[in-house]
Amino acid sequence: MILMPMASVVAVAEPKWVSVWGRFLWMTLLSMALGSLLALLLPLGAVEEQCLAVLRGFHLLRSKLDRAQHVVTKCTSPSTELSVTSRDAGLLTVKTKASPAGKLEAKAALNQALEMKRQGKRGKAHKLFLHALKMDPGFVDALNELGIFSEEDKDIIQADYLYTRALTISPFHEKALINRDRTLPLVEEIDQRYFSVLDSKVRKVMSIPKGSSALRRVMEETYYHHIYHTVAIEGNTLTLAEIRHILETRYAVPGKSLEEQNEVIGMHAAMKYINSTLVSRIGSVTIDHMLEIHRRVLGYVDPVEAGRFRRTQVLVGHHIPPHPRDVEKQMQEFTQWLNSEDAMNLHPVEFAALAHYKLVYIHPFIDGNGRTSRLLMNLILMQAGYPPITIRKEQRSEYYHVLEVANEGDVRPFIRFIAKCTEVTLDTLLLATTEYSAALPEAQPNHSGFKETLPVRP
């Protein structure tokens, strides 16, 4: 593009009336013009080199950030430690960025909310708090004030979640730090008490005779329901009856997607592999075990990608998983954690939930990550004496929301969600064998008077 004017200058026809002096003057002017153009082009070349250097620098920085697993912003409790990379904190900042007009409206709404609260009009105040956060999701003062408001309503878990979210955005916010120091011990107490309730129910389930026909029937139904819900979460449209037909008869359902039916067969194969090979196995869970699970999950749908790590970058909602070249390294680190003493000392539900989250965070496969993560979670639960649990398709929105909250820095809502699913499974088994359901301990309401709710999206 730059050379085109030069070509046109050279191609100008010389007038016939030009004298020798005129020819000399013409050549002098042409030399000056070429010299000026070269003087202009040389800096442009330098600028181009600088641009390329900057791009190379960005590429190098991106690579370093992808590998910077130890440069972290931690948002943890002593019982549940999860590190979030600085890159992910940046993604959160981008996500919560509001327009200048939105920020002004958020501040006005917060001031009105505080005034309504002062006047005792708590219903209006709550709506205004939520409106402020809708206008500016990263408004730390609004998060902190809504946390105080929730704490006054004795919704300690919600308050602690809001303080934690504020600190994820602004780690040195003084008021949020003070408030979270107050709520954290209370929340840990609530969580541990809930785990104790689950342990009590597990002991009741384990006391049911293995030959119980009622238990056998409900476990069989649970098996079909688990496959139905875990593929439905991913968008599979087969009904429970159709899934039962496929697995019992080995015949395809006419008029239905063969790919969806192969997803069901793959889940069935993966669950058989876990039940027959891994549950009773003594020893570490390895990368090969996870690859074998995935090979069965995806093997009937995409045999080329089944059982192998992805080779392309993917985007999952607001989350950017690790670069493909870092997947194997992160899976090795994940496996080390999976078999570490720290992980083994966690409560089984907490351990299983964290394993699920960490695997889906890495997103090591091109497809089938959610199904594989849920299977790994159930493997850990079964090895600890818990029954496999089911996340129902009706819970899909809540499930994805708490995963997103975990990506933002607080994994505890996801752990509580898995704990709630675990309790539903245990209650189902106990109620199906009614003689063992007497005097079940209740997790809610708890004796402290605190509400035990999952955080809601403002």
Curated annotation (Swiss-Prot):
Catalytic activity field: L-tyrosyl-[protein] + ATP = O-(5'-adenylyl)-L-tyrosyl-[protein] + diphosphate; 3-O-(5'-adenylyl)-L-threonyl-[protein] + H2O = L-threonyl-[protein] + AMP + H(+); L-threonyl-[protein] + ATP = 3-O-(5'-adenylyl)-L-threonyl-[protein] + diphosphate
Q: How is the cofactor bound?
A: Divalent metal cation. Prefers Mn(2+) over Mg(2+).
Q: Find motif (Inhibitory (S/T)XXXE(G/N) motif) and give its ranges.
A: 230-235
Annotated positions of the O-AMP-threonine modification: 80, 183
Where does the chain cross the membrane? 24-44
Provide the active-site residues from the annotation: 363
Location comes to: Endoplasmic reticulum membrane
Q: Which UniProt keywords apply?
A: ATP-binding, Endoplasmic reticulum, Glycoprotein, Hydrolase, Magnesium, Manganese, Membrane, Nucleotide-binding, Nucleotidyltransferase, Phosphoprotein, Repeat, Signal-anchor, TPR repeat, Transferase, Transmembrane, Transmembrane helix, Unfolded protein response
Task: Describe its membrane topology.
Answer: Single-pass type II membrane protein
- The Fido domain, residue ranges: 285-420
Residues carrying a glycan: 275
Manganese recorded as keyword: yes
Important for autoinhibition of adenylyltransferase activity, annotated site positions = 234
Which cofactor is essential here?
A: Mg(2+); Mn(2+)
Gene3D superfamilies from the entry?
Answer: Fido-like domain (1.10.3290.10), Tetratricopeptide repeat domain (1.25.40.10)
The segments annotated as topological domain Cytoplasmic are 1-23
Gene Ontology cellular-component annotations: endoplasmic reticulum; endoplasmic reticulum membrane
* PANTHER family in the record: FIDO DOMAIN-CONTAINING PROTEIN DDB_G0283145, PROTEIN ADENYLYLTRANSFERASE FICD
The record's note on quaternary structure and interaction partners says:
Homodimer. Interacts with HD.
User: What is the protein's name according to its record?
Assistant: Protein adenylyltransferase FICD
